Amino acid sequence: MKRWAIRIPNRTSQHNVSQEKVPAVPPRPLLFTRDFGLIWLSQLMSQVGDGVSNLALLWFVYSITGSPVKTTIIGLIHTIPPIVLGPFIGVYVDRLPKKFFLIGSNVFRAVLMGIIPCAVSTDTFTVNLLYGLVFLDAMAMAMFSPALTSSVPMIVPRAQFTAANALIQSTTSLGIIFGPAVSGVGIALFGSQEVLCLNGATYFVAALCLGMVRLRAAQPSAVEPETTGGSAWQDFKEGLAFVATKQRVILLLILTAGCYGFGASALSTLFPVFARKLLGLGPVEVGYLWSSLGIGLLVMSIVLLWCTERTLADRVNIIFWASAVSGLAIVALVWMKDIYVVSVLMIMIGGGMGAFTPIAWGVVQELTPRMMVGRVLGLYGTGAMTAAISGISVFGQITERFGESMGIAGIGAIFLLTAFFGSWLSRSIRNRERAL
């Protein structure tokens, strides 16, 4: 019996033993895996492109109109498609191949932000035409963002969701660091329209990289049943019911994201106005300051790579501390006139802002069934963007009526409110973990 007891485990559990030994081999860093590395490279190219085009767009409108309100229209237009179409786009992200959205969006943006500005003469390249291009670009982004985030679980292990999200955000950081600086120099040398024209190539390269990515099919398990197959309207209602009744932590997350978006979108849209009016800076200097924000984002993205072993509640608590630091640094901008001090504050603000999105995406990815991630992200985007468009509008009016200092102070207060919601969300998740 003793020999029988030894032989049977050795013979029947050989496969299991080999499986247990696999984790002992250190996994390859995410950036050096084929599929995630290609996604990261594609995002780097498109984010650098965004960094170049964003400053060029805002500077073009403000230099022509001289109006903070008309400048904020750029930001407002960017938020309309996610608000109106976000939940329904999420339904089709769950139903259709995600590469269709990933590749198609980048090709479409290359045509919009590259080829069209090249084809239109300087005399006919008006602010109204630019508004139209921005609206179509926002539609492409509304399709791309949920497709990208819901693709992460198809190529990355669950334990590395936050790390993967942080690495994806690091491309945003690098885009903010290099994009505006290149854009500022390009605007000074050539002009806004020419910068947009040359920038279209970045989106074509991004599409090429995404074309080589291999996404695993999402296979529903016993605990994650198939949730698609009915009508699109039925799928939409299932996603709404999941957020509203089955997983209310995500509903609180959307509320927190709305508060964050209310302040962050206003800061991003109005920053050229603040820098030009309060500090008297030109496009090159504004580009460098914007790059400082990107440095902070990059540092936080790197820090989050070491937070994957923490519980979800502990990771969410980082939002509380990061938002509080950002809020205080934004308020301090009111009194600081030295450009080097302002650069340090912008790094602090960027670091605080950099914590939110990777952690928030991780909450959605970990608490949502695989076949429903697109719909939940669509609802998340609608809530966040509705708040963002409100923040841009409100602070555009505040800045125009009461001055830039009042606008900055108000944005800082919103970040402090985000810190409160982050603490509340962390406690709610901790209570949920204890209940389980």
Q: Could you describe each region identified by the protein language model?
A:
Residues 4-5, 84, 101, 115, ...:
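C-terminal transmembrane bundle of multi-pass solute transporters/carriers
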Residues 20, 211-238, 432-436:
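Flexible cytoplasmic inter-helical loops of multi-pass small-molecule transporters
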Residues 22-81, 241, 245-293:
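Helix-loop boundary and gating motifs at the non-cytosolic
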Residues 28-33, 48, 120-124, 227, ...:
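Helix-boundary and loop/linker segments of multi-pass membrane transporters
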Residues 65, 97, 119-120, 336-337:
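Helix-breaking motifs and short loop linkers at transmembrane-helix boundaries and internal kinks
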Residues 37-54, 77-93, 97-112, 129-188, ...:
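Substrate-agnostic recognition of the 12-TM MFS/MFS-like secondary transporter fold
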Residues 1-31, 425-436:
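Intrinsic disorder in cytosolic terminal tails and internal cytosolic loops
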